[in-house]
Amino acid sequence: MIQVYGIKNCDKIRATKKWLENSGIDYTFYDLKKEPLTREELQEFVHRIGLDVLVNKRGTTWRNLKLKDKDLSDDEMFQILLDNQTMIKRPVLIKDEAILVGYDEEAFEGFVED
């Protein structure tokens, strides 16, 4: 079963859920606003795909926190991400050991077939 992490009212999440449903694929959705990742879960995500992939530098949270010109260590960025999980690029899809970040229907097709 695929796990989808994101925010319920996010357009990318809505599109992802619709794509999965139209493709007949079962999934479990985790709303990061209602069920934030634990430190350990976020560490696992970062370990598997890296902060650069996980952080949404185009989003509202990134802009509101004015992080663009700050020189932050990975530890500082991790803590900011843990405290501001709306800054996680969406969606995050997990299937077994595979993880996929961002909305990309072509990538979804390969991801669900593996």
List each language-model region with its residue ranges.
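Local sequence-structure signature of Cys/Sec-based thiol-disulfide redox active-site neighborhoods
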Residues: 1-18, 22-23, 28-32
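Thiol/selenol-based redox catalytic cores and closely related redox-interacting motifs
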Residues: 34-114
